[in-house]
Swiss-Prot record:
Keywords: Cell cycle, Cytoplasm, Nucleus. This is Cell division control protein 24. One of its GO terms (biological process) is Okazaki fragment processing involved in mitotic DNA replication. GO terms for cellular component: cell division site; cytoplasm; cytosol; nuclear replication fork; nucleoplasm; nucleus; site of double-strand break.
Length: 501
């Protein structure tokens, strides 16, 4: 099954399951694609389709639960209600007061009210130009309820530093514009959120940020190619959970006080700005495309989608979306917008993301996703899928430095420098048919790790090409992800890390 077919099947099955359980399906294609890909990354050894659909259904239910339970106050008044520090709350701030203790007046979607004592780190939000609390949505966690709240007959949350005001872009354009134009404060796009652990087992969360340079004539964000990283640990480990990937974060006084900081510190404030699909004309579509990367130019790329050529336009500030891609990679690009002039043309938007599906382990180890080509004779121009191959000969042809070539579209193909070596390999399929295929540079590294003395070859002065006979290594059969381009050249994009049975 191909990836678009997989997404279509998941969507149909998930909608049917939710309807059977009297639940309203409430998810977008964009959410479904991202959740599916994150699961494929989480389980690289592979899993069955029933497990996949169950995981996605659970995630969908949890998503709805967060929207309903933690934005309601009713359940908190029950005697058996248990509140955990990691619980997140989303409430609307309708007012605040300064004395005797600076506090916020909050309400849920059913107009039930409560209060929250504001942590002193956020007193800046009472003053111009940051007095945006009234009318905003507040997200917070790591907060307890005042033990004697019942004396006031109103729930009262204690102060917390895991606290983020959330603004809707459409309702705060003038504020956003003034912040982007400011030389003291900085707006960032939240590109990614990753979790890692140190050698001592301490969890650290890293948020990848792209700086907003300016706004275009339509008010859309123009984003710098460079990336900033901020790490969260200790008392701030929960803060990134309050953020949304591909949305926008304002950090006051970044340019004058916090610039160069790599760790979130006491006194830092974040304000989240949410863009809806209708905020800009170019974001009215939520399209996505899957295909093999066939060509890259200075302002567009071309995908080969089962023989159909799809052009996707991007600006200079969006080049980083494709920085790790290589000709022949199977890409999933979303969301993108249809061109008004040509239905086969698309353009990137500010929250476009690119996933290299052919780099995932799962398509090579999960039967429900693998497109088994069975034998070499099934390979022809435009075909892509998976094939069992056994390596015979490895030929190192040179270094990937300023490597370009011409395609049938008469556009210059720029092959990004992913690895310094490029190579081709002679292989055989299960029927003992032999053929040659170009190797994606990361595949060269894979075989280099299996060949003794490989590094020593390049410590000597040797001329390319370098021929290595692999028969004596008895490498066995491996699943590979393979693609045949328009010039009938075979490209091996990914080799399974485990030999086939």
């Amino acid at each position: 099954m191909d990836f678009p077919g997989l997404i279509k099947k998941i969507k149909e099955d998930l909608e049917n399951r939710l309807v059977e359980k009297s639940k309203q399906p409430a998810f977008t294609d964009y959410w479904l694609i991202n959740k599916t890909i994150s699961l494929l990354k989480e389980y690289p050894s592979g899993f069955s389709y029933p497990i996949l659909i169950n995981e996605i259904e659970l995630a969908c239910s949890e998503r709805n639960k967060l929207d309903n339970v933690f934005s309601s106050l009713e359940w908190l008044t029950k005697s058996d209600a248990v509140i955990y520090l990691e619980d997140q709350f989303h409430f609307h701030c309708y007012d605040y007061y300064y004395t005797p203790i600076p506090s916020l007046k909050l309400k849920d979607s059913e107009e039930n009210t409560c209060e929250m004592i504001l942590h002193s780190s956020f007193y800046l939000l009472f003053h111009e130009p940051f007095n945006i609390l009234k009318g905003s949505t507040l997200r917070f966690s790591q907060s307890r309820i005042h033990q004697k709240w019942y004396l006031r007959k109103q729930i009262r949350f204690l102060p917390t530093t895991s606290f983020v005001p959330v603004l809707q872009y459409a309702a705060s354009k003038s504020f956003v514009k003034s912040m982007v134009e400011s030389t003291e404060h900085e707006f960032f796009q939240i590109r990614d959120i990753t979790i890692s652990k140190s050698d001592q087992g301490v969890k650290r969360i890293t948020v990848e940020l792209g700086r907003i340079i300016s706004l275009d004539k339509k008010g859309a964000f123009l984003i710098d190619n460079n990336t900033n990283f901020i790490h969260f640990s200790g008392t701030y480990h929960d803060f990134p959970k309050l953020l949304d990937k591909q949305q926008y974060l304002l950090i006051p006084f970044w340019s004058t006080v916090w610039e160069g900081s790599t760790n979130w510190q006491d006194g830092m404030i974040g304000i989240l700005v949410i863009l809806s699909e209708n905020d800009f004309e170019e974001k009215k579509c939520d399209s996505w495309q899957v295909g093999r990367l066939a060509a890259v130019n200075s302002n567009f790329l071309v995908l080969d989608n089962n023989g159909q050529r799809v052009k996707i336009l991007y600006s200079n500030s969006q080049k980083h979306y494709f920085k790790d891609t290589y000709i022949g990679d199977l890409l999933c690009i979303s969301p993108i917008n249809h061109s008004s002039d040509n239905l086969s043309d698309y353009s990137c938007v500010s929250d476009t993301t690119t996933e290299i599906l052919s780099n995932l382990e799962n398509p090579l180890s999960s039967n429900f996703l693998r497109n088994d080509l069975c034998k070499f004779s099934n390979l022809f121009s435009g075909v892509s899928g998976h094939l069992k191959i056994q390596p015979l000969t490895l030929v190192i042809t040179g270094f990937v430095a300023n490597l370009t070539r011409q395609s049938d579209l008469n556009t210059s193909l720029v092959l990004p420098e992913v690895n310094p070596l490029t190579a081709k390999m002679e292989v055989i399929d299960c029927l003992r048919n032999s053929f040659w295929a170009a190797l994606r540079p990361n595949c060269v590294s894979y075989f280099a790790s299996m060949i003794s003395g490989f590094k020593e070859l390049f410590q000597k002065e040797m001329e390319f090409p370098i021929y290595l006979d692999l028969k004596s290594y008895k490498l066995g059969f491996h699943w590979c992800d393979i693609y045949v381009d328009s010039e009938h050249n075979c490209h091996i994009q990914k080799i399974n890390s485990l030999p086939c049975e």
